[in-house]
């Protein structure tokens, strides 16, 4: 009987793949033989002659109705570039909102246009380009509809934009060398356009405007025709860099060092769809410092990757999730456990596609530093497309310490099934993996597995998962938050749209349960959350009220902070939570998090606030503050974490940013300042100043200063 049920479900899913075909809107690109003036003015004859994409429909607030303002998109191309011209008509041009100028700044609070291009027409991956009326550039790489785009991908492209009496317009230039596509005489690409009108909190799309779709759902995108004889060729990019600086230690043994370093990166197009990258003497002086956090849990904190060499192509290497065992975590390469840099001598990477296969190879050699020996890191990833949007893949990693014979290996297989027309117009995702490791001295109990079922839709948004991480599962180039556990959980969310009292969507969550045991079945952690009320307003504000109940079993004393210890035992505690967030289009926006109630053998109140002030198009200031007031059986303590970012943009190519942070655990004030100039596309100049002060005696005491000037230049053939 069970086999019959499984067979029927499988047939139903396959039927969705076979019959889920629909007519797609088409835009045709026009080839031009003469050059155009790239200035943001779409007044040349070739622009007027190109047929536009129109008929945008609302996704929000009135789903399926025509957009309240007209949008026209035209596409031209020549031998080297793709040109996209966008006319965003607006009946109230004085009300257009555009605050951002800085490259890769968050455009969510601005009027904007977003373009997604699926060059492989695989309905899975796409290049994302977005801009606002100021011509600020944002780009990303879309990996799959169920995942957020990789916002750290940075392509070489340009945009000019301006506000006009009729609205605003943008002219976008994308070199074909920035994209990857098949070597064919005629190209047909997937493409979609999204416009946001902030003052109306309106989202318009050319295609895929249903609530259960959106700009990231490439299976719902339209198509771009008319592209012939595109030559990407064997692209070669050469990025030499030079760095000069001074480091001064102001501690008990003052010292001063001159910093000099040169190196280069090379990018080579092996085929039109496969790219090789090489790096020598890699440097990341311009990368912003991590936001330091006080860890009040028993497990390691996860920090995101920020280094550009490891960000490009990161989606191909992705395997697993950090909370359930991540086989590859690039921060294990070139960074120590406490975030200090370890020199990278050289590295090579191959990423791209070959037919239905996605390929990723990475080989990096690090130098020794202090007690950390040099090591070689190798990662191999292979993934094959299945059906319309699904895929199956394999991964292998190796860490080798030369001269010692020490080798750590990890390997795994994963399957991702995604259906965007399940039961008609619903989304369903099923994914899972199994992985194992081989470590000298560890035998058996070295596996991890996971299954995840997600039903991410507008009215009902539900998921279920189960995973296991055995005690000897040890991917040394990966991340494992917790071992020797089995964890099962899920959530059920109901999100109706009442259309009254200024409420766009209500969010009810009667079930959100995580149940964790050790491998033997002994309960370790239970987390349950009930959301009796949550809502999103028509103006874009968000509110939620949650009731939570937690169980924790401590099998050893837990030193939570300084000399405060929670003893072995079983603990049940209840707590209440409120979250509120305003729309980022406002001059002053922010978010509030408040949680209070039981905490092990005492009480805790958590207060977290984030604010963003957009003083003008050029200047922004953000502030975040997190405060814990904890009372335990052995005494009380408070934690404080402060952080502030200040940014000033002189133009879209010249900006400064400062990041200041402090917490009362490290008792250090950390300043990270960066000036960034883009003299030409792909080339950069940085001026970086870092200063660390100790504050333990309630006075500022300088401990470390670094001043660096760095420049790189792009040569492209």
Please give the residue ranges for each predicted region.
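Positively charged n-region of N-terminal signal peptides that target proteins for export
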Residues: 1-5
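Sec/Tat signal peptide C-region and signal peptidase I cleavage site
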Residues: 16-20
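Exposed, low-structure sequence patches enriched in small/polar residues
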Residues: 343, 421-717
């Amino acid at each position: 009987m069970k086999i019959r049920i499984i067979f029927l479900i499988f047939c139903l899913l396959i039927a969705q793949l076979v019959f889920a075909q629909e007519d797609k809107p088409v835009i045709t690109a026009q080839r031009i033989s003469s050059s155009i003036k790239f200035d943001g003015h779409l007044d040349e004859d070739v622009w007027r002659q190109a047929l536009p994409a129109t008929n945008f429909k609302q996704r929000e607030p009135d789903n399926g109705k025509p957009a309240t303002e007209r949008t026209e998109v035209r596409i031209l191309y020549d031998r080297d570039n793709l040109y996209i011209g966008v006319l965003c008509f607006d009946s109230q041009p004085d009300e257009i909102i555009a605050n951002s100028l800085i490259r890769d700044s968050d455009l969510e609070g601005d009027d904007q246009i977003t373009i997604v291009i699926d060059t492989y027409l695989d309905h899975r991956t796409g290049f994302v380009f977005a801009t606002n009326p100021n011509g600020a550039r944002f780009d990303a790489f879309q990996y799959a509809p169920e995942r957020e785009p990789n916002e750290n991908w940075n392509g070489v492209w340009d945009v000019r934009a301006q506000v006009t009496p009729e609205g605003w317009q943008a002219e976008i230039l994308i070199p074909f060398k920035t994209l990857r596509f098949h070597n064919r005489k005629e190209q047909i690409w997937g493409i979609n356009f999204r416009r946001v009108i902030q003052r109306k909190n309106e989202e318009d799309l050319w295609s895929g405007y249903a609530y259960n779709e959106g700009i990231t759902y490439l299976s719902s995108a339209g198509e771009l025709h008319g592209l012939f004889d595109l030559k990407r060729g064997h692209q070669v990019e050469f990025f030499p860099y030079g760095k000069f600086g001074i480091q001064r230690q102001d501690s008990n043994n003052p010292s001063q060092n001159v910093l000099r370093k040169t190196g280069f990166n090379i990018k080579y197009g092996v085929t039109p769809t496969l790219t090789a990258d090489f790096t020598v003497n890699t440097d990341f002086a311009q990368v912003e410092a991590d936001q330091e956090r006080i860890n009040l849990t028993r497990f390691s904190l996860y920090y995101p990757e920020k280094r550009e060499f490891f960000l490009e192509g990161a989606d191909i290497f992705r395997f697993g999730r950090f909370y359930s065992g991540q086989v590859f975590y690039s921060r294990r390469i070139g960074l120590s456990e406490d975030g200090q840099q370890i020199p990278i001598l050289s590295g090579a990477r191959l990423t791209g596609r070959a037919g239905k296969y996605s390929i990723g190879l990475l080989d990096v050699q690090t130098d020794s530093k202090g007690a950390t020996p040099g090591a070689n890191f190798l990662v191999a990833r292979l993934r094959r497309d299945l059906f319309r949007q699904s895929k199956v893949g394999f991964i292998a990693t190796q860490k080798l310490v030369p001269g010692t014979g020490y080798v750590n290996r990890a390997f795994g297989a994963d399957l991702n099934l995604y259906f965007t027309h399940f039961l008609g117009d619903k989304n369903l995702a099923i994914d899972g993996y199994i992985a194992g490791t081989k470590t000298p001295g560890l035998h058996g109990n070295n596996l991890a597995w996971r299954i995840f079922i997600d039903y991410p839709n507008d009215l009902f948004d539900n998921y279920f998962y189960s995973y296991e991480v055995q005690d000897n599962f040890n991917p040394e180039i990966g991340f494992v938050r917790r071992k020797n556990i089995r964890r099962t959980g899920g959530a059920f969310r109901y999100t109706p749209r009442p259309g009254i009292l200024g409420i766009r969507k209500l969010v009810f969550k009667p079930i959100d349960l995580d149940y964790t045991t050790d491998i033997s079945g002994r309960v370790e952690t239970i987390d349950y959350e009930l959301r009796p009320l949550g809502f999103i307003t028509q103006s874009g504000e968000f509110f939620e009220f949650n009731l939570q109940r937690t169980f924790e079993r401590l099998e050893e004393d837990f030193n939570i902070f300084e000399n405060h210890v929670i003893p072995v035992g079983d603990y049940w505690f209840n707590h209440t939570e409120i979250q509120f967030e305003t729309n980022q289009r406002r001059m002053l926006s922010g978010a509030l998090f408040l949680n209070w109630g039981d905490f092990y053998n005492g009480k805790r109140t958590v207060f977290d606030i984030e604010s963003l002030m957009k003083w003008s198009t050029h200047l922004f200031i953000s502030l975040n503050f997190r405060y814990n007031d904890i009372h335990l059986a052995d005494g009380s303590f408070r934690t404080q974490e402060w952080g502030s970012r200040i940014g000033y943009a002189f133009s879209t190519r010249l900006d400064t940013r400062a990041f200041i942070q402090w917490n009362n655990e490290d008792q250090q004030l950390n300043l990270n300042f960066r000036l960034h100039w883009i003299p030409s596309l792909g080339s950069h100049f940085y001026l970086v100043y870092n200063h660390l002060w100790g504050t333990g005696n309630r006075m500022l005491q300088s401990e470390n200063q670094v001043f660096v000037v760095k420049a790189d230049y792009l040569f492209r053939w």
